[in-house]
Amino acid sequence: MNNPCGPVPLLFITGFLGSGKTTLLNRILDEAAAQGKKIGVIINEWGRVNIDSSLIRAKDIEIEELNDGQVFCSCLSGNFLEALVLLAKRSLDVVIVETSGMANPFPLRNILCDLKRLTGGHYVYQGMIALIDPESFLDLVEDINAVEEQVIASQRIIINKIELADGETLARIRKKIRQLNPHAG
């Protein structure tokens, strides 16, 4: 599983349902395809049926689907590691994980340690991007722990669909994000 070109970047995209994860993923895939890059994608859905994989437009990608749970919990973390080990056997330039909207990334550090052990350092963690829907974020972050944990764990936070929110709401969202994660870009 040693990659002659160095470790393969591993990037996570997270955010609650409707925040724009699949749209962002499609944009990244379109850009990567234009550059001739080979991409591996793991799509995680909370339910039994994976809707997002049918929305992925790019053709030259390797897709693994993990349904009926979230990749960071014990119910799917073993399958998640297996999918990453499988993708490590392919010649890929980057692997992107689109998490379930309910994903709580708290156990990520342990998963990354297990992944390093299983793949011999094949991957290099490039961070997590959290997408925020301004219409629902302020309510969700108070009611659903996973939303708060996604913001805390992310290196980049994107407030998506800003045209749908007024200036006061955006200011409150930015303030909440800074409270939870002052180091995110």
Show which residues each predicted segment covers:
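Canonical P-loop GTPase G-domain recognition
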Residues: 148-185
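Nucleotide-state-sensitive switch-loop elements of NTP-binding domains
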Residues: 2-14, 19, 23-140
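Helical mechanochemical/support elements of P-loop NTPase systems and associated helical scaffolds
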Residues: 9, 76, 104-107, 143-153, ...
